[in-house]
Amino acid sequence: MTWFIDRRLNGKNKSTVNRQRFLRRYKAQIKQSISEAINKRSVTDVDSGESVSIPTDDISEPMFHQGRGGLRHRVHPGNDHFIQNDRIERPQGGGGGGSGSGQGQASQDGEGQDEFVFQISKDEYLDLLFEDLALPNLKKNQHRQLNEYKTHRAGFTSNGVPANISVVRSLQNSLARRTAMTAGKRRELHALETELETISHSEPAQLLEEERLRREIAELRAKIERVPFIDTFDLRYKNYEKRPEPSSQAVMFCLMDVSGSMDQATKDMAKRFYILLYLFLSRTYKNVEVVYIRHHTQAKEVDEHEFFYSQETGGTIVSSALKLMDEVVKERYDPGQWNIYAAQASDGDNWADDSPLCHEILAKKLLPVVRYYSYIEITRRAHQTLWREYEHLQATFDNFAMQHIRDQEDIYPVFRELFQKQSANQSV
């Protein structure tokens, strides 16, 4: 029985190249559709694929066609209404029809087309969702105590496994060896062939000499052919070696206010922000740890499940979370070896005497050691003392950023604003 094995890169997805070209060509429209769709999802369904719709007019391409003027002769087979030389009135183009997602006004005439809708995968969705985003001020530090290595190409070697064989380099060595081993014989062969050509046309004929030359030529050709086309001496393998790499390990502190002033809608918006942050970190970076801290009057380090699903609540003392973060940094994360980040979400409601203490802890202990600290206030009310204290920090520290979220639609734009990739002249 004959077996066919499909080793093509695309395999079953034979239109992958065309699909990628389409995504590149209409990236702006797709990203706009994704940014609108992210706010309509449930908290637990942020990272799945998405049905993307693009207006038909945006994907139309230029084409050559005949002009509207003039007379034309056409053959319409199968009609029973017209005969030869009948003139057919040209139909008027409809301009009042519906087109798009069904959100327009009704029309009694005209034609249109629905928006073009297609499905993108989870990977494509996340790639577009987090495109052009990065952790600010990320630096690579050489960790003495961390044995982190990366494999690099390091030329060629004469020993290795068949999977690493370099066909081109092996054939080059084979050609060089065969040329070196047969060069003298080929020169001698060329001389004998020239001599045989001269003798064969000479008069009188020298049959014995011709026979001798033919024997020598045959022997030389046999010797040349006995040189193997490729030998184990010719084989070369791609060589790889492990080199110590600068480590870009980072830790992200997620500080969420779960006090009684945070209603369920506000908590859901905070969770949406942190889920986006978690997906961004896990999608973009390999060596990023996440520390989850929930706080009301007391702060507690928790795991991922408790951070998102615990129902515990209480009063509001924001400084408790900042103190706990400072303790964890001193205990586990040396600023000289770690890139430290923090994202704090709150409704801004805090005990009045505690807000100046938050300012002091951030200014003296945390901001000098973190790469970037972001504060997100989720409220529709007027800003209170915590926001005003943080405004002074923003004016003093370049690595402190703050944003205001009023509604669910603000989450993704604020997230992109906080983690927008810096240009070369802006990076530290």
Curated annotation (Swiss-Prot):
Concerning NCBIfam families, the annotation shows: PRK05325.1-2, PRK05325.1-3
Quick one: where's region Disordered? 78-111
The record's family statement is: Belongs to the UPF0229 family.
Bias kind Basic and acidic residues: ranges: 78-90
Q: Where is the composition biased (Gly residues)?
A: 92-103
Report the leader peptide range.
none
Show the taxonomic lineage.
Answer: Bacteria, Pseudomonadati, Pseudomonadota, Gammaproteobacteria, Enterobacterales
Give the protein name, as stated in the record: UPF0229 protein YeaH
